[in-house]
């Protein structure tokens, strides 16, 4: 099994505040006296996007997760629930949010480094746990397997398919996100039982790749 996630670079050369329009003007309906700024969401369009994602899953057999780091408006989780396989979290509290708001859905979590004082609680929420390094896998993997969790390792394939985004390319040289082949080979030589802990691999790519 392979897990993949995407990160989208900022498309705008000159970022503007989210509550202004393309010309930098404040929407009149939001900037009057005593009117708080707020997000406006079109539920019909949100559902349409969900239908598109559901169609992709049905045609390909893949699973699409809600990346809570990018969108954690839990009031709308019930709207998205029919279209998505579950949630993706970057730590304990996002994983808990996904479990509380979408209890019947899959709960995936990846963190660059898990905390020992939080990991036992995390096991109450997460179904799939991805580790960033062989060290983290060796430290926490046995407990995750004993709890019946699906265990993965984030890998760095050390291969980029585009230029211009090196500063946040997780596959760039020197990236500390994911395990390189050399790092894995060295760790597996010292700990031959590491491969037995794994159910799959996770790789992260930019959305243009």
Which residues does each PLM region occupy?
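An N-terminal domain-start capping segment
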Residues: 1, 57-59
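Active-site-proximal beta-alpha core segment in soluble small-molecule metabolic enzymes
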Residues: 62-209
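A short alpha-helix capping/helix-coil boundary motif
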Residues: 30-34, 54-57, 72-76, 166-167
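Generic signal for short, ordered secondary-structure residues
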Residues: 24-25, 32, 59, 77, ...
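Short, flexible, solvent-exposed loop/turn segments with mixed acidic/basic and small polar residues
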Residues: 27, 54-56, 116-120
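Alpha-helical packing segments of well-folded alpha/beta enzyme cores
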Residues: 46-49, 53, 187
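N-terminal glycine-rich anion-binding loops that anchor highly charged ligand groups
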Residues: 22-25, 52, 58, 64-65, ...
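Alpha/beta catalytic barrel-like cores
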Residues: 1-34, 38-43, 47-49
């Amino acid at each position: 099994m392979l897990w993949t996630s995407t990160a989208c670079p900022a498309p705008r050369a000159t970022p503007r505040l989210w509550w202004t329009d393309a010309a930098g003007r404040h929407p009149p309906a939001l900037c009057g006296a005593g009117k708080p700024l707020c997000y406006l969401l079109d539920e019909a369009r949100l559902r349409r996007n969900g239908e598109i994602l559901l169609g992709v899953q049905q045609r390909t057999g893949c699973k699409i997760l809600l990346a809570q780091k990018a969108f954690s408006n839990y009031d709308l989780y019930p709207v998205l629930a029919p279209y998505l396989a579950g949630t993706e979290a970057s730590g304990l509290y996002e994983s808990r949010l996904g479990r509380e708001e979408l209890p019947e859905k899959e709960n995936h979590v990846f963190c660059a480094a898990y905390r020992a004082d939080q990991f036992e609680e995390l096991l109450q929420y997460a179904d799939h746990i991805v580790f960033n390094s062989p060290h983290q896998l060796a430290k926490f993997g046995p407990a995750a397997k004993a709890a019946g969790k699906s265990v993965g390792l984030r890998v760095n394939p050390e291969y980029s398919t585009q230029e211009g985004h090196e500063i946040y390319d997780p596959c760039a040289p020197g990236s500390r996100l994911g395990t390189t082949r050399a790092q894995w080979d060295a760790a597996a030589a010292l700990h031959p039982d590491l491969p037995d802990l794994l159910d799959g691999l996770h790789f992260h790519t930019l959305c243009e790749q």
